[in-house]
Amino acid sequence: MPGLKRILTVTILALWLPHPGNAQQQCTNGFDLDRQTGQCLDIDECRTIPEACRGDMMCVNQNGGYLCIPRTNPVYRGPYSNPYSTSYSGPYPAAAPPVPASNYPTISRPLVCRFGYQMDEGNQCVDVDECATDSHQCNPTQICINTEGGYTCSCTDGYWLLEGQCLDIDECRYGYCQQLCANVPGSYSCTCNPGFTLNDDGRSCQDVNECETENPCVQTCVNTYGSFICRCDPGYELEEDGIHCSDMDECSFSEFLCQHECVNQPGSYFCSCPPGYVLLEDNRSCQDINECEHRNHTCTPLQTCYNLQGGFKCIDPIVCEEPYLLIGDNRCMCPAENTGCRDQPFTILFRDMDVVSGRSVPADIFQMQATTRYPGAYYIFQIKSGNEGREFYMRQTGPISATLVMTRPIKGPRDIQLDLEMITVNTVINFRGSSVIRLRIYVSQYPF
């Protein structure tokens, strides 16, 4: 019996002592054996592995491993405990071979899988999908992500974990949208300002070329960033609605655009001249047409065509009144031997001239001068007749000359006849006589 007792003791000790070289195999990857307690402790890879997760990923330690997840999705660590925190440090070592004796007992024990695993039909430890079996402890606002030997409680995109709850992330605070952002639970929506359209990326905005898509302008459309402007053709101005164009009345801007008349037309204007004038190359000034030179008049062969500003005059032949006699084409003389000529001007000379309507005053318009200067004689110049309106006066400019001055602007058309008298006084021979210039002034209708 003492020999049998020794054999049983050795067999039992063989069952409980670890197999040489197999101590590290008691802990799987991700765990390390604590030699003092004999327990398998989790390895914190996030601390021991340099740059375990890179970029914008965050390292989260798990029992037996670690996860790299986006920083916007913090991991909720479930409340389950370390499977190796109990006194059991299995799996158990294989049983020692039985003592080769038919009457000695053989001791064996069943295989056990660690926490998070279960035995399949082939006696293999396989991972338990806690998410599929609904054996997790994730909050209803969270989602369960199965891992090897465990699970992770995480949040969907658009949420972040805070004190076990998934809270909505306000993406609008981080400038995800180029222009307008509207936060919604778990997501966000980007929109664009008027004049822009959302690109396919759902975030950036692109200018809309309204001139190509709508062309709202009546005349010319110019696209701008986010909008457009309408422009009008020359001669038009933009209305208050910013779209329509209305004709610009250039003639109302200034009375000096045209010398005579400004005629407005859609988008432009033109200058016109009255009959008897032609428009010059500057398209604003009018020039008189000399009908007499162009033989574009209605005078008879006996009449003389006299050109005026804007017209012409047909002047009849000079007819001298008694007792005057015609000398030449434009002079009448009273014979000295005729007693009826004693108190009459010795000669009457006919002259014609024209002035424009409203001519600025004072204006020197005609000059009168004696042809001969006699010793001891002096000359007096005056307006004998036709100046009832006091529109003229004679200014003597020298001993034998004087100038007719117009003192008031005269509006045409109008014909004026003045008798300008030159009186000759000779004290040596006691002589006094006179000569007259009968000046016919034709005032035109227009001031040009």
UniProtKB/Swiss-Prot annotation:
Its main location: secreted. Residues 245-448 are annotated as: Interaction with LOXL1. A motif (Cell attachment site) lies at residues 54-56. GO terms for biological process: cell adhesion; elastic fiber assembly; extracellular matrix organization; intramembranous bone growth; negative regulation of angiogenesis; negative regulation of transcription by RNA polymerase II; positive regulation of osteoblast proliferation; positive regulation of transcription by RNA polymerase II. Keywords: Calcium, Cell adhesion, Disulfide bond, EGF-like domain, Extracellular matrix, Glycoprotein, Repeat, Secreted, Signal. Glycans are attached at N283, N296. GO terms for cellular component: collagen-containing extracellular matrix; elastic fiber; extracellular space. InterPro entries: cEGF (IPR026823), EGF-like_Ca-bd_dom (IPR001881), EGF-like_dom (IPR000742), EGF-type_Asp/Asn_hydroxyl_site (IPR000152), EGF_Ca-bd_CS (IPR018097), Fibulin_C (IPR055088), Growth_fac_rcpt_cys_sf (IPR009030), Nephronectin_domain (IPR052235). N-glycosylated. Residues 1-23 form the signal peptide. Homodimer. Monomer, homodimerizes in presence of Ca(2+). Interacts with ELN. Interacts (via N-terminus) with the integrins ITGAV/ITGB3, ITGAV/ITGB5 and ITGA9/ITGB1. Interacts with FBN1 (via N-terminal domain). Forms a ternary complex with ELN and FBN1. Interacts with EFEMP2 with moderate affinity. Interacts with LOXL1. Belongs to the fibulin family. Essential for elastic fiber formation, is involved in the assembly of continuous elastin (ELN) polymer and promotes the interaction of microfibrils and ELN. Stabilizes and organizes elastic fibers in the skin, lung and vasculature. Promotes adhesion of endothelial cells through interaction of integrins and the RGD motif. Vascular ligand for integrin receptors which may play a role in vascular development and remodeling. May act as an adapter that mediates the interaction between FBN1 and ELN. This is Fibulin-5. It comes from Rattus norvegicus (Rat). The gene is Fbln5.
